[in-house]
Amino acid sequence: MQLLAGERRAGHPATPPDPRLRATLALSPSARQPDAPPGLTQRFAHLRRPFMGLTGSRDDGMGLSDITAANRELPYRHAPAGIDGPNKYLLVFAGGNHLDFAGQASEAEGSLFAVRREPAVFRDNLLAASTAFWQAHLGLDAGARRWLVTDLPGHLRPTDRFEFK
């Protein structure tokens, strides 16, 4: 999804963002090979349309992976700020792991990765934030955009983090 939104992969030529995408919501976003040329700022320079990254403080990659929870924040950190007000958002749910963003874990996943089978404690906030994002940026709803930056933080747990630019 990030490639369609305008990310340039390390070591690959730049490709324009897909014009059909008006906004991107990325569950567990990432930046593979963060130290590779051309650098993260150039790699994410074309992420100009609205973008929301949803991740967790324990959202490491599955198995042997170069993705850490901190890496999940890099697309937001290196994307340009919105021109006419905030249009880039990062929501980090405390304790959230990778499978929390895939829905309810199956019995096999639960036994392999020791994850809970019930929905994540932050599920309602994830749904509210993502719905407001779509309403704000696809529906051009100024009230939803205002709620996202002013009211959403009051609904989050004290250990969750929400940023926008």
Regions found by a protein language model. Give the residues of each.
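Primarily recognizes the serine-hydrolase "nucleophile elbow" in alpha/beta-hydrolase
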Residues: M1-L47
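Intrinsically disordered, low-complexity boundary segments flanking structured domains
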Residues: G11-A14, R72-A81, L148-D151
